Amino acid sequence: MTASAQRPAPQFNAFAASCPSRRLLDTIGDKWVSLLIVALGLRGPLRYSELSSQLEGVSQKMLTQSLRRMERDGLVTRTLTPSMPVRVDYELTSLGRSLLVVMSQLKEWAELHMPEVDASRAAYDADHR
């Protein structure tokens, strides 16, 4: 074995400012990316227009940027089908599917605890007027 083959895998520490895992956390922590992961995980491959309809309020620019970031990071695949008009489908990769449970739980947690968060916000705002 060569010396380079014996080297341990690089260690990552997201608490360190220079760690590349921070950029990955920026991507998966983005609200549109997290919702895209859940939407694609629940419904399977979807066309751009279906994703746009599923995620109310997302602009074309943000949807496009989010999908490109996800594709670059290996979370989704983009498949073009030659037709009139061209059909483009997005699907989670196995790496993207590995995030599905976590993102689904986070979405469900937010939906379940929204009344408590709203009450806390109202109390905070009342105390800080």
Predicted regions span which residues?
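Hydrophobic alpha-helical core bundles mediating ligand binding, dimerization, or RNAP-core interactions
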Residues: S21, L25, M103-A110, M114-R121
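Basic, amphipathic "hinge/linker" alpha-helix immediately C-terminal to the N-terminal HTH DNA-binding motif
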Residues: P82-L106
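Glycine-centered, phosphate/nucleic-acid-interacting loop/turn motifs that mediate DNA/RNA or nucleotide
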Residues: G74
